[in-house]
Design a protein with these regions (language model features):
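Cysteine-centered motifs
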Residues: 7-11
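Ribosome-associated RNA-binding proteins
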Residues: 15, 23, 33-225
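Intrinsically disordered, glycine-rich low-complexity segments
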Residues: 28-30
Length: 225
């Protein structure tokens, strides 16, 4: 036990020395600069990512004019159409399902990408790459701002903050109204249950309850619905 504790202390001192040598001993505000790993080991304050619950409510007008905004983070959503897009646009899939939001909410671009990834992975394992068509209908136009502050032990000594601060750009979000479709999925009748499960998993990534609605194909699903 003593040997492990001595090794831990030695590693902590080594990392702290390395950070000091790389970034200098003091920062612009006079506080000591420490890397995130050293800060975690020594229990110091670090800049934490705020939870999505802080951004899910619709407040004020949308902040979207990117030509006047500098430094907007890149969008995490890589694809809005996945699967057999040609068959979907020509109407070859007899069953169409939609995932709709139950509340007015803001959905961050990271949540939209996570929902797309999990739903696409679920349906592709069963239907194959050409047996479905998935589409994300919402685009994260709204730019999120955050007043950066240090959090953790001793943070109140160095970061008092300012009331009603404008903040810096930290991400983007889509403003979704109640009943608005977020994701749609087109499949063949034999993959209906898997498609519902894929949209259910996608809804778990959003900060609001969602409803899966069958838009087309009731006549092909006798005994399943």
């Amino acid at each position: 036990m003593n040997g492990a504790h001595e090794c831990f202390c030695r590693c902590s001192r080594y990392l702290l020395t390395l950070i000091r040598a790389t970034f200098g001993r003091s920062g612009r505000g006079g506080g000591m600069i420490r890397g995130p790993l050293v800060a975690g080991l020594l229990g110091e304050f670090i800049m934490a990512r705020k939870p999505a619950s802080m951004y899910r409510r619709l407040k004020g007008p949308a902040y979207t004019r990117r030509k006047f905004i500098g430094g907007v983070p890149n969008n995490r959503i890589h694809q809005y159409h996945v699967g057999n897009r040609v068959a979907a646009e020509t109407g070859k899939f007899p069953v169409i399902l939609e995932l709709r939001a139950d509340n007015n909410v803001q959905i961050r671009h990271t949540a939209l990408e996570a929902a797309r990834v999990i739903s696409n992975s679920t349906i592709r394992k069963v239907a194959g790459t050409q047996g479905y068509a998935l589409r994300v209908h919402t685009f994260p136009h709204h730019v999120l701002r955050e007043n950066k502050q240090a959090t953790g032990a001793g943070a109140d000594r160095v970061s008092q903050g300012m009331r009603c601060a404008f903040g810096k750009n930290v991400g983007t979000a889509a403003r979704v109204k109640r009943g608005q479709r977020v994701i749609s999925l087109q499949v063949h009748p034999e993959y209906y249950l898997t498609a519902r499960d894929a949209l259910r998993k996608a809804s778990m990534k959003f900060p609001t309850p969602c409803t899966v609605r069958l838009i087309k194909g009731h006549e092909h699903l006798k005994g399943l619905i």
